[in-house]
Structures are given as structure tokens and as C-alpha cells.
Amino acid sequence: MSVVSLLGVRVLNNPAAFTAPYEFEITFECLEQLQKDLEWKLTYVGSATSSEYDQELDSLLVGPIPVGVNKFIFEADPPDLKRIPTSEILGVTVILLTCSYDGREFVRVGYYVNNEYDSEELNKEPPTKPIIERVRRNVLAEKPRVTRFHIKWDTDSDPTEFPPVQPDADVLEDDGETYGAEELELEAALKRELEELDSQDADKMDVGEGRDDVDDNESDAGSEDLEGETSGSDDEEEEEGFEGEDEDVEMGDDSNPTPDQHQHPNPEVMVH
């Protein structure tokens, strides 16, 4: 739960000249006493193709903040034309109003801004070099894009550090040098065990040749009951196996996936 909630933002001077400062009336609610100030920023997106043209127009520290509903006026300078490509001055762009606590952004409000001339003639046939004195901006204040982020506040416990600290990672042996060594050792051990089992089976066959007739009679005597029991148990195991598979699929248990299962990590969604 967020300690600070943004209740509303009003764009006071809108529409306005391109060179006029931005003015916002911001209303927010604070649920508990904060140890530090809130930092508000206004960023102008100078180009849709590259973030290098983004400009931080102004920032403001607000505090100490009393518990309850608070309201203040945030005024920011217009963008620096020297940092905007000439082809990007006119048209639609974006401004971002953000608020952070202790360096952690928890709310972002995006507005579309339309920059155009104040006459139809100039808009139909714009001059090669923009006439800034005739350019007006119109912030689409009725359609803001609000994004909220979960952050750590004063009373929250520290989040689990990810990835975990691994102080011995640099002194460990390079995986590239030992890649596949363990598999080769297991394969060699398995071959040795199979060879030993083959030699033991050969010895047993030599000793047990004299008991073939007796073993055949004994096996024939109990074969009927054993087959019946075996077939019944096989059916039960088969039914149980299908029930288990249905349960795994239905419950979504991926702890023991079958070889033909393909696991697709959910993309992680990202809103801008």
C-alpha cells in the first residue's frame, strides 16, 4: 500500500505559448509522517526516436509533509529549444510529471502535448525555420496516463536483495574448463557397473543350469495366480498414473515436469 496517493493534477495555463512556463496544481494525500521530502520532476520528451533529447524542465522538493490531504503549485521552465531537433519542435510530444521518495519513483503522469502554429496558414505551409513566437502548446489534460510503482517506505522492511551477494563468485573455477566433466565421470561409472553385472549374470547361469527343470516346474505352478495379480496391479497403476497426470495438468504443478512439457516464462509486462 502506498503511503502517498496522488489525488489530482490540474494544468493551470493551458493552452499557452510554447515559451511559457508550465504550471500544475497538484493534490495528494499522505497517510503517515514521512522522514524525507517528496521530489517532483517535470520532463519534456524532445524526440520520439531517442531519449537523449529528453529534458528535465524542473524539480521541486516538498516537505516536511503533514499527514492528510496536501496541495501545492508546481511551476517549471519551458524546454530549451537548442536541445530539441528542429524537425521535432512542431507536432505531438509528451511531458512526464513524476514523484519520488528517497530516490524511488512511485508515480508517473504522462500528458500528450500538441505544438502548432496559432494560424491555419502557418500550419498548412510551415516555414523551414520554426517561428517560435507563433507556436502554441496544448496539453491534453483530460487524458493523462498514470502509472504507479510499489516502493519501500519508511515503515516497510527492506526488500529481498536480488540477485543475492556471492562474495566467492570470483574465486570459483571457471565453468568452461569443467563443462561436461561430471557427466563423463557418471557415464564411466555406469559402464563399470554394467560390466560387473554382466560378469555376475554369467557366473549365475553356469551354476544354475542344473536347476532349470525344477525352476520351470515351480514357475509353472504359480504362473496363473501371478499373472492375474500382475495384470490387475498393472491396470491399477495405469489408472493411477492417468489420474496423477490429470491432477498435475489441472493444478499446474511444475515441480516434476514430463519430458515433453515446454515451460514458457511469462513475459514480464512492461507499462510506459
From Swiss-Prot:
* Composition bias type Basic and acidic residues, residue spans: 201-211, 261-272
Name the source's superkingdom: Eukaryota
Q: Which UniProt keywords apply?
A: Chaperone, Chromatin regulator, Coiled coil, Nucleus, Transcription, Transcription regulation
Coiled-coil blocks? 181-206
Show the GO MF annotations. Answer: histone binding
Location in the cell reads:
Nucleus
Keyword NAD in the entry? The reply is no
Gene Ontology cellular-component annotations: chromatin; nucleus
Q: Alphabetically, which GO biological process terms does the record hold? A: DNA replication-dependent chromatin assembly; nucleosome assembly; nucleosome disassembly
Compositionally biased intervals (Acidic residues): 212-253
Q: Where is this region: Disordered?
A: 152-173, 195-272
PANTHER family this protein is in?
ANTI-SILENCING PROTEIN 1, HISTONE CHAPERONE ASF1
Function in brief: Histone chaperone that facilitates histone deposition and histone exchange and removal during nucleosome assembly and disassembly.
Which family is it part of?
A: Belongs to the ASF1 family.
Per UniProt, subunit arrangement is: Interacts with histone H3 and histone H4.
Under which name does UniProt file this protein? Histone chaperone ASF1
Q: Which organism is it from?
A: Coccidioides immitis (strain RS)
